C-alpha cells in the first residue's frame, strides 16, 4: 500500500475503499507494538468501528493484545466516576440511546440492547476522561463467568 493511498480514511472500511483492496487482504501494523495484524484482528478492529491512526502518512490499527492492554491502562489512568443512565443523560443532554458508549474491554460501540441491559440490571456506566464506557453483552458474560465484575472494572 502506498503512503498516499487512503490518507483521508478514518476507518479500515474507508481505507480499503480508497486503496481498492479488500478487508481480509489488508496488511496493517499495530500502532503500539508494530506487529502486523492477523486477518481476524483486522476484521475485529473494523467490526468495533475503531479509527485508523496516521503517523508519517502511514495508517496504523491496533492488535487485540494491545487494545486490551492499553484499554486497561486507559481505565486506570482516566477513570473519573461510575454513574447510572439518568446521570449520563443529564450530563450529556442526550438520551442513553443517543450517547456513544463503547465497551470498556473490547471497545466496540454498545448497541441499544446492551445499553438497555445496563439499565435493567441497574449497572453503572464508567466515565473515562471525556467518554463513557460500559460492557457489551459478550464481555459482560465473560466477566460474570470469571466472577470479576465490579462497579469500576472487570
Curated annotation (Swiss-Prot):
GO BP term, example: symbiont-mediated suppression of host innate immune response
Q: Where are the zinc fingers (unnamed)?
A: 30-66, 103-139
Query: Which Gene3D superfamilies does the entry link to?
Result: E6 early regulatory protein
Task: Tell me which Pfam families the record gives.
Answer: E6
Keyword Zinc assigned: yes
Miscellaneous comment in the UniProt entry for this protein: Belongs to the low risk human alphapapillomavirus family. The cancer-causing human papillomavirus E6 protein has a unique carboxy terminal PDZ domain containing substrate but low risk E6s do not possess this domain.
User: How is the subunit organization of this protein annotated in UniProt?
Assistant: Forms homodimers. Interacts with ubiquitin-protein ligase UBE3A/E6-AP; this interaction stimulates UBE3A ubiquitin activity. Interacts with host TP53 and EP300; this interaction inhibits TP53 activity.
- What role is this protein assigned? Plays a major role in the induction and maintenance of cellular transformation. E6 associates with host UBE3A/E6-AP ubiquitin-protein ligase and modulates its activity. Sequesters tumor suppressor TP53 in the host cytoplasm and modulates its activity by interacting with host EP300 that results in the reduction of TP53 acetylation and activation. In turn, apoptosis induced by DNA damage is inhibited. E6 also protects host keratinocytes from apoptosis by mediating the degradation of host BAK1. May also inhibit host immune response.
Q: What is this protein called?
A: Protein E6
